[in-house]
Amino acid sequence: MDQTLTQFGSVFVFLLLGVIFVVGGYLTSRLLRPSRPNPQKNSTYECGEEAIGSAWVKFNIRFYVVALIFIIFDVEVVFLYPWATVFKPLGTFALIEVLVFAGILILGLAYAWVKGDLDWVRPTPNIPKMPPMPELPVAKGASQKD
């Protein structure tokens, strides 16, 4: 029981020292920094240029598609690394499992590729124009509305 409290106590002391370090650094920098606000310092700074327009701009959805595909394959590597470190004791069954896992991801990538979601500039469809419809003859005695 005493050893358990000692272990929790050391974790508590470590967390307390971490909080004190962060708060102490923040307070020290706040006390030592000069504070002379003026309109030029309070203006928005963007790479040395005056900000033009709103910061809320619409990004092309393809940026998000590329980012999502990157995250999917990044997570795949996170799952494959532990598997690769203990591959020999797991045997053939583990190899088949990881091949199925990678195959599902590759099928998803192939589907996105074939669908055209990975193309940065999508081609515009070439739809032929239909010739105008000929006017139908009007029966005798029927009135035409113009």
From Swiss-Prot:
Question: Which topology term describes how it sits in the membrane?
Answer: Multi-pass membrane protein
Superkingdom of this protein's organism: Bacteria
Can you list the GO cellular component terms from the UniProt entry?
Answer: NADH dehydrogenase complex; plasma membrane
Keyword terms = Cell inner membrane, Cell membrane, Membrane, NAD, Quinone, Translocase, Transmembrane, Transmembrane helix, Transport
Q: What is its main location?
A: membrane
- Catalytic reactions on record: a quinone + NADH + 5 H(+)(in) = a quinol + NAD(+) + 4 H(+)(out)
Bilayer-crossing residues are 8-28, 63-83, 93-113
* Record EC number: 7.1.1.-
Q: Iron: present as a keyword of the record?
A: no
Q: Name one GO molecular function term.
A: NADH:ubiquinone reductase (non-electrogenic) activity
Give the InterPro entries listed for this entry.
Answer: NAD(P)H_OxRDtase_bac/plastid, NADH_UbQ/plastoQ_OxRdtase_su3, NDAH_ubi_oxred_su3_sf
Annotated compartments = Cell inner membrane
Tell me the protein family, please.
Belongs to the complex I subunit 3 family.
| Task of the protein | NDH-1 shuttles electrons from NADH, via FMN and iron-sulfur (Fe-S) centers, to quinones in the respiratory chain. The immediate electron acceptor for the enzyme in this species is believed to be a menaquinone. Couples the redox reaction to proton translocation (for every two electrons transferred, four hydrogen ions are translocated across the cytoplasmic membrane), and thus conserves the redox energy in a proton gradient.
Give the protein name, as stated in the record.
NADH-quinone oxidoreductase subunit A
Source species, please?
A: Chlorobium chlorochromatii (strain CaD3)
